Amino acid sequence: MALGYIQRYLPECLRLGHSRSTLRLKMIRSMPRYLLALLFLLTAMPFAKTALATTSCSPLLSHTFPRLQDEAPQNLCQYQGKVILVVNTASFCGFTSQYEGLEKLYAKYKDRGLVVLGFPSNDFGQQEPGSNKDIADFCKNTYDVKFPMFAKSSVSGSNPNPLFKMLIAKTGTTPKWNFYKYLIDRNGNVVDSFGSMTKPASSSITGEIEKLLGEKI
C-alpha cells in the first residue's frame, strides 16, 4: 500500500518540477500516519538486526584477556561469528615450530572467517619462562606471527584461565602439553579438540575448518 502511494504521488511531483529535497518533504507531510509508521519500521529493522547480532555473544567467548603485545584488554566477543582455533603455545618446546603452520593456516582462511587465538603458557615443562614482551618479540621475530596472541596465563591444573576452564568442561579434555588445539564454530560452540602431535596443516584440522566455514550462522 505504501509503495502504491509513492508510485501515484511521485510522477505528479516530478511533473510539477519539485526538487528532490522538496519532493521528499512533500511526500512525508502528505503521507497518512500509518504509512509513516510503516516506513519507519522498515527503515529501522536492518539496524535493529545488526545491533542484535553485535550484542549477542556466546558464553564461551564472554571473556576479556590482555593482548600479548601491550596488555590492552581484548574481549573475545569480537570473534563471535568466526571459526576459532584456540591454541596454548610455548616458545621453547619441541612443537614450537607449529607457529609457522598456525600462521599459514590463519593466512589461508582468515578472509573466509577463521581466526587463530594463541595463549602462551608456562604450564608444561616450564617452556614459556619469559615475559609477555619476550614472548611477543620471539613470535614476531622468529615466525612473524600475525594472528591474535594473549598474555601468558595458565591453561591447565587447578586454575586455568576462564576460556580454557570452559573448553575443558565442555570437551572433557584438558591440554596435555603445549600446542593443544580447540576448534570453535561460528556460533561459539566448541566442536573438536586436537592433540599436540596434530599439525595445523593436517587434514583432520583443515577438513573440519573447511566444513565449519561453509556453515551458516
Regions found by a protein language model. Name each.
Residues 5-9, 18:
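Low-complexity, intrinsically disordered or signal/transmembrane-proximal segments
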Residues 13, 21, 25-36:
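Bacterial N-terminal signal peptides that target proteins for export
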Residues 36-46:
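Bacterial N-terminal signal peptides
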Residues 49-77, 97, 162:
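N-terminal "domain-start" segment that seeds a small globular fold
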Residues 80-84, 110-115, 143-148, 178, ...:
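Loop/turn elements at helix/coil->beta-strand transitions in domains of secreted/extracellular proteins
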Residues 88-92:
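Amphipathic alpha-helical repeat scaffolds
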Residues 95-160:
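Structural microenvironment flanking redox-active thiols in thiol-disulfide oxidoreductases
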Residues 162-165, 169-217:
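Thiol-/selenol-based redox modules, centered on thioredoxin-like
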